[in-house]
Curated annotation (Swiss-Prot):
PANTHER family: HPR KINASE_PHOSPHORYLASE, PROTEIN YJDM-RELATED
Protein name according to UniProt: HPr kinase/phosphorylase
One term of GO molecular function: protein serine/threonine kinase activity
Cofactor: Mg(2+)
Family, as annotated: Belongs to the HPrK/P family.
Region (Important for the catalytic mechanism of dephosphorylation): 271-276
One of the Pfam families matching this protein, by short name: Hpr_kinase_C
Region (Important for the catalytic mechanism of both phosphorylation and dephosphorylation): 209-218
Amino acid sequence: MDTSSINAQSIFDDNAAMLKLSWLTGHEGWERGFSADTVANATSSADLVGHLNLIHPNRIQVLGEAEIDYYQRQTDEDRSRHMAELIALEPPFLVVAGGAAAPPELVLRCTRSSTPLFTTPMSAAAVIDSLRLYMSRILAPRATLHGVFLDILGMGVLLTGDSGLGKSELGLELISRGHGLVADDAVDFVRLGPDFVEGRCPPLLQNLLEVRGLGLLDIKTIFGETAVRRKMKLKLIVQLVRRPDGEFQRLPLESQTVDVLGLPISKVTIQVAAGRNLAVLVEAAVRNTILQLRGIDTLRDFMDRQRLAMQDPDSQFPGKLV
């Protein structure tokens, strides 16, 4: 990941209003940031932002009331030594939180070394939590995938397939049935947590759907505010294919998944053929996926019935699967 654009200036601009930050000194060091190695070796954003800790170099150091109080109780010699060690770590910037006054020696050393020094009336814990969330978002793994991303029955579904299979037309049909559009053609995905991937629409394509023969359609204007979504978690990928019947597996015995940013995402394959109601099939696939997430697997239940029937031909089964 390119970390060159992540520096003291960009972090300050993005968080100054929310965290009530003031830039006290060290303006010349606005380009300070994280090295690629530091980001690569970080297991989480907690490695990049935290309370004052002289063991962790290249880290955003936050000094709260407890740290300032401890500093005030030190001898002049210890104060000077601690401040020298802190500046020698070359942090991207320092934050004095909790409305505490920045120690004069710290201000002087930051000025001389061009180390950005911020102050805020907010508590150190609140600043750390907010900056960790911010860092986790901007450093999260990202990818752009081709397809139509929709909200179907509250589930994020990506329609994929070769060009000309009718993905956009299918998306338009699903939107007309009350579902919502997130993005068409290019979908930006980011892994924001250990167990979910979130998809958004690039600003340039917001609310737009391209349909052959009709051109660009503004879905929000045509269908209303409820027909579009800002973002959704990706839960299912529906791949549209056109192939001879002999190559198509009617009952896949194993669940299919696709790796997206290191996370396995459920996948179903739907064959495109004349006369097939693809919108109904996609809705059924989504409903079936919802059942699977709840622990209900229709195919597995059928296979269990089949095995029991082979073992005991006289056994009776209920009229429904669940």
